Amino acid sequence: MKMASVRDVMSTSPVTLDPDANVYEAANTILVNRISGAPVVDTDGKLVGVVSELDILNAIVTSVYNGADPGIARVSEIMTAEVESNAPDDDVVSVAREMLDNKRRRRPIVEDGVMKGQLTCRQILRAVTDMVDDAQ
């Protein structure tokens, strides 16, 4: 069975967030696109972090609880800056194993520091089932 590369399976235009966006803008992007998180990309296309819906919810609830305006917080303040990523030519099955081991639902795909796409569990599941179907 031939293993696909990440490039063959990844999305090349994932929803991304701007590090300067406020938490309400980030929440709206997450809700409108029905996703659970997104990579944070600067104006040069460089991956600078990731934000989950839990990060956003935590920022809003914490601000409200403390009597502060939750709209003041920026994505850059609540994002996870240490991001696991892979390259477009990596093997899908190996990346899937890493994602499972680290309990991650999505993986940014980066080449020369620039975000090229994103790989999700659903895309991997589709690719693996297609490989099995083709082998039968």
What are these regions (language model features)?
Residues 1-13, 52-85, 91-100, 115, ...:
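Tandem CBS (Bateman) regulatory domains
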Residues 16, 20, 46, 65-68:
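A generic helix-loop boundary/linker signal
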Residues 17-34, 41, 86-103, 110, ...:
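The conserved cystathionine-beta-synthase
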Residues 25-36, 54-62:
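Short, charge-rich amphipathic segments
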Residues 30, 38-54, 99, 107-123:
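A glycine-centered beta-loop-beta connector
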